[in-house]
Curated annotation (Swiss-Prot):
The gene is cca. Mg(2+) binds at residues 21, 23. This is Multifunctional CCA protein. Catalyzes the addition and repair of the essential 3'-terminal CCA sequence in tRNAs without using a nucleic acid template. Adds these three nucleotides in the order of C, C, and A to the tRNA nucleotide-73, using CTP and ATP as substrates and producing inorganic pyrophosphate. tRNA 3'-terminal CCA addition is required both for tRNA processing and repair. Also involved in tRNA surveillance by mediating tandem CCA addition to generate a CCACCA at the 3' terminus of unstable tRNAs. While stable tRNAs receive only 3'-terminal CCA, unstable tRNAs are marked with CCACCA and rapidly degraded. ATP binds at residues 8, 11, 91, 137, 140. Magnesium is required for nucleotidyltransferase activity. It comes from the Bacteria. InterPro entries: CCA_bact, HD/PDEase_dom, HD_domain, NT_sf, PolA_pol_head_dom, PolyA_RNA-bd, tRNA_CCA-adding_enzyme. Residues 225-326 form the HD domain. A single active site specifically recognizes both ATP and CTP and is responsible for their addition. Its cofactor is Mg(2+); Ni(2+). Belongs to the tRNA nucleotidyltransferase/poly(A) polymerase family. Bacterial CCA-adding enzyme type 1 subfamily.
Length: 417
């Protein structure tokens, strides 16, 4: 019985990165051997055991065989006769198909070290095509390391999409990989890879439809709506924004794909037009509620947020109420963060100031100065409970109006200069 450190731990060690999780493979053993040594079985689908002391995962070396379409359609064979190389051969990419023995020696039968040095993602064997999740994983690794994908691998990924393998992916796995990819340093790269292999059209057709849709060059020097979406997503990542914020950045402009051709490159009403496509994506991916809600909120209101300097005080109050800013100020703030990414996610506009965020937050704080509890008590004491909401709005408007007037005056002064 021999044990080897495998997969991501070896890859990250060779890259000089912190090793977070260690996975081990055991050669020359079976389940009875592991149980006799105190290991605890945990794998439902595969022979995986927890070490009695470290609680790290140890898997028996195994081979796999495709039995049906989709990521779950596999049978496996785990026995004492399965070699380390056979186990490594079933893995997705060469950079993940390396092992390290107890003495520190690297076992690399498929050229993983060479590909690491060259910054290449390359599949180990044709068996890569048997698991459609590998399309998403490869795109995610590209986003993490900014590696290029080997020509033969991207070709194989295209064939998988054409053969309908991507259609077999279940929502939970798509969301799981998409969420991980969005949180990588370069999420733009993930979307680019998915588009290059054709998977974006299958998994996120609403995002794919943005590419080739023109925008006004004076607002968007990058012209293409899809490119702007990628730039907004990447800006959100560079800002260190959360998963819900990055997801909202990805979907914020879906309405531009719905713009009638005769009014292009203008996109009047794309904020409203995008709401239904955002809902469709949320439902299809089964996105978590906090992600889904923020994506819809940003899509619906980002243009209004941008144009705060043009709004009347009553409109501002209506927006604060409709976006639930009084009850959920943290979510309101995250929506404004995405608006910064939207503004700066344009060609040569990466450092454009966004005073609207601070102003919206100041408006919300000012409106909150109206003591709703006191107003309600006074109305009830006067027998005018039916006027509570109206009186609260009146007090909030009194707080908002001077702040908005000052902001507009400062804006006018800046424009004149």
């Amino acid at each position: 019985m021999q044990t080897y450190l495998v997969g991501g731990a070896v890859r990250d060690y060779l890259l000089g990165l912190p090793v977070k999780d260690r996975d081990w493979v055991v050669v020359g053993a079976d389940a009875q051997t592991m149980l006799a040594q105190g290991f605890q079985p945990v794998g439902k689908d595969f022979p995986v055991f927890l070490h009695p002391e470290t609680h790290e995962e140890y898997a028996l070396a195994r081979t796999e065989r495709k039995t049906a379409k989709g990521y779950a359609g596999f049978s496996f064979h785990a026995d004492k006769d399965v070699t380390l190389e056979q186990d490594l051969m079933r893995r997705d990419l060469t950079i993940n198909a390396m092992a390290q023995d107890a003495g520190g020696k690297i076992i690399d039968p498929f050229g993983g070290q060479r590909d690491l040095a060259a910054g290449i993602l390359r599949h180990v064997s044709p068996a890569f095509a048997e698991d459609p999740v590998r399309i998403l994983r490869t795109a995610r690794f590209a986003a993490r390391y900014r590696f290029e994908i080997a020509e033969e691998t991207i070709k194989l990924m295209r064939q998988m999409v054409e053969n309908g393998e991507a259609d077999a992916l279940v929502a939970e796995r798509v969301w799981q990989e998409l969420a991980k990819g969005l949180m990588e340093k370069n999420p733009r790269k993930m979307i680019e890879v998915l588009r290059e292999c054709g998977a974006l059209k299958v998994l996120l057709p609403e995002v794919n439809a943005l590419f080739g849709v023109p925008q006004r060059a004076d607002y968007h020097p990058e012209i293409d709506s899809g490119i702007h979406t990628l730039m907004t997503l990447q800006r959100a990542a560079d800002m260190g924004l959360s998963l819900p914020e990055r997801y909202a950045a990805l979907l914020h402009d879906l309405g531009k794909a719905k713009t009638p051709p005769d009014i292009l490159p203008r996109h009047h009403g794309h904020d409203l037009a995008g709401v239904e496509p955002v809902r469709e994506v949320n439902q299809r991916l089964r996105a978590p509620k906090h992600c889904a809600e923020l994506a819809e909120l940003v899509c619906r209101w980002h243009i209004i947020f941008h144009q705060v300097g043009q709004l009347k005080s009553q409109t501002i109050l209506n927006v604060l109420k409709k976006t639930d800013a009084f009850r959920r100020p943290e979510r309101f703030q995250t929506a404004l963060n995405v608006c910064i990414a939207d503004t700066q996610g344009r060609l040569n506009r990466e450092h454009t100031p966004y005073p609207q965020r601070a102003h919206w937050l100041a408006l919300l704080e000012a409106a909150n100065q109206a003591d709703s509890g006191k107003i309600a008590a006074e109305c009830r004491a006067q027998g005018k409970a039916h006027l509570i909401a109206e009186q609260i709005d009146r007090m909030r408007l009194a707080q908002i109006a001077p702040l908005q007037k000052a902001f507009q005056a400062a804006q006018d002064k800046t424009e004149k200069h």
